[in-house]
């Protein structure tokens, strides 16, 4: 039986996600702050019409979201799939060229914030796009691919994904995986460990720490398993996509960041109908208490809509053969994801209540990512940066208010 038949009447996720009320001050803070999200929506999986993407990104711009790490490829996608996906995105964005800035450095993100355009930061959630050819990594850098996940859920030449590990197989990082990491480090592309099995991820972190000490790596969209494991609603084994405290602490040691996803089905056992600002704040707060405010980001991991996701899961059964975990979560109502434009201002109010300062939130919403971007993409470590990040943010904000007030 197809997964589509198992989930009748599946409705849009983020498109119909709840808009949460927020104070005027919080709404303005989001507009005044560089905010960098993350969405997991290749064409045909998340969005299927150009207007769909434009509407989503216009809502984000209106709310003050500066930019997004946008997923071009995942799972077992090939080089040819990557080229097709980039064409789909670029051709749609070419319809409104003034709305988009394609990011190769932090300066591009700052320019997008000043102008009120969308900063486009490409990512790939799989290394299978290389088609076995390491020389393609250099081309990825020129294309603006900012980060790469080695293995998505299942097993490939680099190692084992989180679902494979959940099902009992995680043999760790392979020589091919190490060879890819060498090329990522060589060309300044961030190693992303979300979707990766724990042993494979730990092996990758060991390799990075040994061969490239001081180069940060990240979990771009992963929830903390520890937030849910002791709750009454928790499932016996937890969600296979969530990470351990040990993994998060390793990222801190590298100087990287961890961003929680606002995806409802990964909120083990809770599986809300609509993720609340309080629940989103809980995710952020957990990581801040664990690894510190300098190593936490945000990543809605939005899919635009879950309808194509169900079809994708049906066509790629091995990637989602999880003992019905995801389907049980869907059946429980957790079919959505917190869309940043609809929830972030309310999350801001909640974090203010918990004692977070504006400086803290500026780091979490975008500053920590930009520090890692600058270090990996541009080779400028924080201690070697001639401009203090706070001074840099103030310069950007002054320019925005002078030339593009909103």
Segments (PLM) and residue ranges:
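Bacterial N-terminal signal peptides
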Residues: 1-8
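N-terminal hydrophobic targeting/anchoring segments and the immediately downstream early-domain regions
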Residues: 9-167, 186, 209, 217, ...
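Loop-centered beta-sheet repeat module
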Residues: 170-206, 211, 215-222
């Amino acid at each position: 039986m197809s997964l589509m038949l198992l989930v009748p009447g599946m409705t849009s996720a983020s498109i119909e996600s709840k808009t949460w009320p927020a104070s005027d001050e919080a709404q303005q803070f989001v507009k005044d702050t560089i905010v960098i999200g993350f969405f997991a929506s290749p064409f045909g999986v998340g969005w299927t019409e150009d207007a769909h993407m434009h509407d989503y990104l216009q809502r984000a711009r209106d709310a003050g979201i500066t930019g997004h790490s946008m997923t071009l490829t995942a799972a077992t996608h090939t080089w040819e799939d990557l080229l097709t996906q980039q064409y789909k995105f670029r051709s749609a964005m070419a319809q409104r060229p003034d709305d988009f800035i394609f990011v190769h450095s932090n300066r591009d993100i700052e320019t997008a914030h000043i102008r009120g355009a969308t900063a486009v930061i490409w990512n790939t959630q799989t290394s299978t796009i290389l088609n076995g050819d390491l020389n393609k990594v250099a081309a990825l850098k020129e294309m603006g691919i900012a980060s790469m996940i080695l293995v998505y859920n299942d097993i490939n030449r680099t190692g084992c994904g989180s679902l494979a590990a959940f099902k009992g197989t995680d043999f760790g990082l392979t020589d091919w995986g190490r060879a890819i990491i060498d090329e990522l480090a060589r060309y300044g592309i961030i190693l992303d460990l979300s979707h990766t099995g724990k042993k494979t991820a730990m092996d990758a972190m060991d390799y990075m720490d040994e061969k490239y000490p001081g180069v940060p790596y990240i979990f771009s969209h992963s929830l903390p398993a520890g937030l849910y494991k002791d709750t009454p609603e928790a499932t016996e084994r937890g969600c296979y996509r969530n990470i351990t405290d040990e993994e998060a602490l390793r990222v801190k040691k590298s100087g990287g960041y961890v961003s929680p996803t606002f995806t409802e089905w990964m909120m083990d056992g809770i599986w809300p109908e609509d993720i609340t600002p309080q629940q989103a704040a809980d995710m952020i707060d957990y990581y801040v208490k664990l690894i510190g405010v300098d190593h936490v980001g945000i990543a809605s991991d939005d899919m635009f809509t879950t309808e194509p996701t169900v079809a994708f899961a049906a066509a790629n059964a091995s990637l989602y053969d999880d003992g019905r975990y995801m389907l049980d979560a869907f059946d429980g109502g957790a079919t959505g994801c917190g869309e940043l434009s609809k929830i972030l201002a309310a999350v801001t109010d909640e974090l203010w209540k918990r004692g977070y300062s504006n400086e803290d939130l500026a780091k979490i919403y975008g500053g920590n990512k930009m520090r890692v971007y600058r270090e990996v993409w541009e080779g400028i470590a924080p201690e070697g940066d001639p401009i203090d990040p706070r001074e840099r943010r103030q310069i950007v904000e002054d320019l925005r208010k002078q030339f593009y007030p909103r």
